[in-house]
Amino acid sequence: MSDTIAAIATAQSPSAIGILRLSGPDTRNVLDAVFFPRNGRPMSQQTARTMVLGRVLDGEGRVVDSALCVLFPGPDSYTGEDCAEIHCHGSPVVLNEGLKLLLSHGARQAKGGEFTQRAFLNGRMDLLQAEAVADIIDAETAETARNAAGQLEGVLSRSVQAVYDTLMGVTSRFYAIVDYPDEDIEDLQREQLLDALRESENKLTELLATFSRGQLMKQGVPTVLLGKPNVGKSSLLNALVGYDRAIVTDVAGTTRDTVEESLLLGHVLLRLTDTAGIRETGDAVERLGVERSRKAAQRASLALLLLDGSVPLEQQDEEAMAVAESAPHRLVVVNKSDLPCVLDKAALEKRFGSVLAVSAKTGAGMAALCEAIGALYPTGAEPQGELLTNARQADAVRRALSCVKNAHASLQFGMTPDVVLTDAEGALEALGELNGKHIREDLVDTIFSRFCVGK
């Protein structure tokens, strides 16, 4: 990290403000060559952390833009190095011209996530907090943003560190026993060590249990609309999203492929898939669509099974119901409530639970449907920021938990201290990967490569 990096930190589309970002040992010199304060003093001599009015000038003294600049001296900066931001007008042309000037005076184009990677490597944040930065940027719901903010504040990091410290106490005791084999573990010490391992196991179990909700919160709930052809699935999709996303006709089989859309219902983010109607068909294209419908249902967390309340159930309805039953959660939606209902709702409720009546045509019952979906995915009771939200985190916790369980069992059944120590060390290694204390450089590069440039 001996070089200085630069990047455009804001979206490259016309806007009121655009930001150029710098970090590294040569930040002050690069600034002095590009940004010229109105008060006449070089930027390197300006008061730190104070916005300074000036101009960005090219090599021939021509004005590129009037701008504001702020210097953040290291180590008390985002990256732990000297950092700076130039706040220009948000023209992509102006921002790119400004970036070219920074690069021409010795800065290097930053890679994706490189600013945050430097913050991690310089000890300004751990790996969990660094991942929270990306989660905040990518957040599609307020709940996701709140959880990421809590994680950035260190909520998850502190929970992990508490388990890490407990296991360090266990391993230090077993190091002493291994180094001095003539010492036996007294009964009281054995119980204390068992309690410590049990406490760690319970906390890791709780953390791992948050992953499924963290994934649904971050990625959204995979939701499939199922039903026979022409039952109103596309009309329901359009009613939910609020515009004509899918083609609606009176011709059965109009939807021949899956149609996907995202929808925020309160705190629940749905990844909606409108499927081809479930039926046997001789049409090759429609048959492929039906097969995709079945596969979408297998991947779904929620199936919305749509039935036509104005006509009796048919074989195609039974086929759709059989597919819906494979989903972890399912809601039966009886469409066309604006027409007389001829279905046996009691039988449907006995098989599927609650049955909701809606009219995709008039909008009747849509509010109740949204409430029912929200009730299936309530806001959790976990502290804000203490949800595992990606597979890397879950895998590390899963490995740590397995090692802790093995260590507890080994100690309980009188295995030799070195056996217990090996498992306890394995748990520490996994937790070290989780928060970045002990992690391979190539894994760090992979994690930060997923970030956007400028962050």
Feature locations, PLM:
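Inter-motif core of Ras-like GTPase G domains
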Residues: 286-310
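C-terminal-of-GTPase-core extension/linker across diverse P-loop GTPases
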Residues: 2-8, 12-15, 54-55, 142-264, ...
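Structural motif
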Residues: 89, 307-310, 336-337
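A glycine-rich (often HGG/GG-containing) alpha/beta subdomain
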Residues: 1-146, 150, 154, 331-332
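Switch I (G2) and immediately adjacent beta-strands of P-loop GTPase domains
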Residues: 52-65, 69-73, 253-281, 299-302
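Short glycine-/small-residue-rich Rossmann-like dinucleotide-binding loops
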Residues: 241, 276-277, 301, 308, ...
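Generic enzyme active-site microenvironment
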Residues: 272, 306, 333
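Conserved beta-strand segments of alpha/beta enzyme cores
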Residues: 108, 269-271, 354
